[in-house]
Design a protein with these regions (language model features):
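Acidic, PIN/NYN-like endoribonuclease modules and their adjacent C-terminal/linker elements
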Residues: 1, 37, 97-131
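Short beta-strand scaffold positions
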Residues: 4, 36, 69, 87-90, ...
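N-terminal interaction/assembly modules
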Residues: 42-45
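Acidic catalytic patch
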Residues: 63-94
Length: 131
């Protein structure tokens, strides 16, 4: 599973910086499932509402990405992550962590998310960002 946080989803949908590199990265494993937390769907749609008109965003995201529900385990992992990470970002990291051995990468364009995810042993990727 390739987990995308909201920063990656927004780049992918809007064509923001690194969108081309992200599309190329994802195209390398077309059979690999992609997922995000329930929080990822909400964050992405709320941001898209502010930056443009994307009337089918939620439908499109739900069709392309597996939704990872916030469980007690994810809640507890998110609460116990090292300091320096925002609440929603902690939920993304914990959601990726919950995928376990099936997780190929957590994709993000947020340096704090990448640093903390890496520090707890999660494989990370930021295609085009030079990490």
């Amino acid at each position: 599973v390739i987990y995308l946080d909201a920063s990656a989803l927004i780049s992918l949908v809007t064509g923001r910086p690194y969108a081309l590199e992200l599309r190329e990265f994802l195209a390398q494993s077309p059979e690999m499932p992609m997922g995000t937390s329930t929080i990822g769907f909400i964050e992405t749609v709320r941001t898209l509402d502010r930056v443009g008109t994307y009337p089918t965003a939620m439908h499109d995201l739900l069709a392309a990405f597996t939704e990872i529900l916030v469980t007690d385990e994810i809640r507890d992992w998110a609460a116990s992550l090292p300091g320096g990470v925002r609440t929603l970002d902690a939920i993304h990291i914990a959601s990726a962590q919950a995928i376990g051995d099936e997780l190929a990468f957590l994709v993000s364009y947020d340096k704090r998310v990448l640093d903390i995810a890496h520090s707890v042993g999660i494989p990370i990727a930021a295609p085009g960002m030079g990490r």
